[in-house]
Curated annotation (Swiss-Prot):
<feature type="transmembrane region" description="Helical">
    <location>
        <begin position="43"/>
        <end position="59"/>
    </location>
</feature>
<keyword id="KW-0812">Transmembrane</keyword>
<keyword id="KW-0325">Glycoprotein</keyword>
<keyword id="KW-0256">Endoplasmic reticulum</keyword>
<keyword id="KW-0175">Coiled coil</keyword>
<feature type="coiled-coil region">
    <location>
        <begin position="290"/>
        <end position="325"/>
    </location>
</feature>
<feature type="compositionally biased region" description="Basic residues">
    <location>
        <begin position="1"/>
        <end position="11"/>
    </location>
</feature>
<dbReference type="GO" id="GO:0005789">
    <property type="term" value="C:endoplasmic reticulum membrane"/>
</dbReference>
<feature type="compositionally biased region" description="Basic and acidic residues">
    <location>
        <begin position="18"/>
        <end position="30"/>
    </location>
</feature>
<dbReference type="InterPro" id="IPR024152">
    <property type="entry name" value="Inh_kappa-B_kinase-int"/>
</dbReference>
<feature type="glycosylation site" description="N-linked (GlcNAc...) asparagine">
    <location>
        <position position="151"/>
    </location>
</feature>
<keyword id="KW-0472">Membrane</keyword>
<dbReference type="GO" id="GO:0005730">
    <property type="term" value="C:nucleolus"/>
</dbReference>
<feature type="coiled-coil region">
    <location>
        <begin position="64"/>
        <end position="257"/>
    </location>
</feature>
<comment type="function">
    <text>Target of p53/TP53 with pro-apoptotic function.</text>
</comment>
<protein>
    <recommendedName>
        <fullName>Inhibitor of nuclear factor kappa-B kinase-interacting protein</fullName>
    </recommendedName>
</protein>
<keyword id="KW-1133">Transmembrane helix</keyword>
């Protein structure tokens, strides 16, 4: 017994520096393992940053496109004001037609006024052609704007679908990282339990075989201590990784919460854009109706020109026939025929003015309906 005790006492003094050497020798592979864990973490963080930057860039582009849509809507408003200017031109044309009645009344004094009347009719024809050309340009612009609005709405819908897909991907990544962390923690706990059980077994075996294999037990204890130190370091590294993964999970949740109000804003702007598209379509339909009405007015103007030419030819024939008749009879007949012509012109002007008022009232009612909508 005394010999066994004397052997045990000097043993630890000699073998004390050996675990330090072994622990120093095992630091390098553990450090290498930590570098290996850092590479996928940095890659995942870079991927998340790249995706967040891409999403921010998409949102910025969509805001720029929405600003362009607003500018195009303002252009539509300016074009509607130009259309009101065309309506004022039509009212001026009606005023000119009323002035033609006065010129017909003054036709008894001299035939030179007839040439002026023909010039005014030609000017009216030119103004009508200009109005038709401007209306064609407006219809083309409205068609182009309708196509642009439809393209923009399609782009908004696509971006919303992409945003929802990206949020789902972020959620799945966060869940996967959380599950990986929990698995690593559980595995580390199981390893610690196994090590504690091994320590108990080793202690029991040392108590049983302390007399026979003291040196072997000391070596086993040194190995176990080295393993414990390495395992504790591994556990500390796993805890650090758990902290980093939890911080990353929090960052991902914050990013998701920051993207959700942007998605809701996009969804809130969609109905306004759709209402604008519907209003533009209605305005285009109203313009088509006004074009038809303007075509009817041009037909009426051509008929009026034919009637005026017929009246001029009749007046010339009357002058030729009245050259051989007395002066008094010629004046009476001329007055009667001019009264008849005035009546015809007055009836035609009343009919044309009534048709124009009806078309303008219908257009105003349709515009009120679109504004109420």
């Amino acid at each position: 017994m005394s010999e066994v005790k004397s052997r045990k006492k000097p043993g630890p003094k000699v073998a004390a520096p050996e675990p330090e050497k072994r622990s120093d020798g095992r630091k390098n592979p553990e450090a290498r393992g930590g570098a290996g864990w850092a590479d996928p973490r940095t890659g995942l963080s870079l991927l998340s940053l790249a995706t967040s930057l891409g999403l921010a860039w998409l949102v910025f582009q969509q805001s720029e496109k929405f600003a362009k849509v607003e500018n195009q809507y303002r252009l539509l408003q300016t074009e509607s004001s130009e259309f009101q200017g065309l309506q004022s031109k039509i009212s001026l044309i009606s005023n000119k037609l009323e002035s033609t009645e006065n010129t017909l009344q003054e036709a008894t004094s001299s035939m030179s006024l007839m040439t002026q009347f023909e010039q005014e009719v030609a000017g009216l024809q030119r103004s009508i052609h200009d109005i038709e050309n401007s209306e064609e340009m407006l219809t083309q612009k409205l068609q182009n704007l309708n196509e642009k609005f439809q393209n923009i709405t399609d782009l908004w819908k696509r971006t919303l679908v992409e945003m929802s897909d990206n949020t789902a991907v972020f959620k799945s990544e966060a869940k996967s990282t959380h599950s990986e962390v929990t698995l690593k923690i559980n595995s580390a706990e199981q390893e610690i339990k196994l090590l504690t059980e091994r320590l108990k077994d080793l202690e029991d075996s040392t108590l049983r075989n302390i007399r026979t294999v003291s040196r072997q037990e000391e070596e086993d204890l040194l190995r176990v201590e080295a393993q414990l130190s390495s395992d504790t370091k591994a556990v500390e590294k796993l805890e650090e990784e758990q902290r980093t993964l939890l911080a990353r999970d929090e960052d991902l949740t914050d990013k998701l919460s920051s993207y959700e109000p942007k998605v809701e804003e996009c969804k809130a702007h969609l109905p306004t854009i759709e209402n604008a598209v519907h209003s533009v379509l209605r305005v285009s339909q109203d313009l088509i109706g006004t074009e038809r009405k303007m075509e009817e007015l041009t037909v009426q103007m051509f008929n009026m020109e034919d009637d005026m030419l017929k009246a001029v030819s009749e007046i010339m024939e009357m002058q030729n026939t009245l050259e051989g008749i007395q002066y008094d009879n010629s004046l009476l007949k001329m007055q009667n025929e001019l009264v008849v012509l005035k009546g015809k012109v007055h009836d035609f002007m009343a009919y044309s003015s009534a048709g124009e008022k009806g078309t303008l009232e219908e257009y105003n009612l349709e515009n009120k309906g679109t504004d109420d909508y």
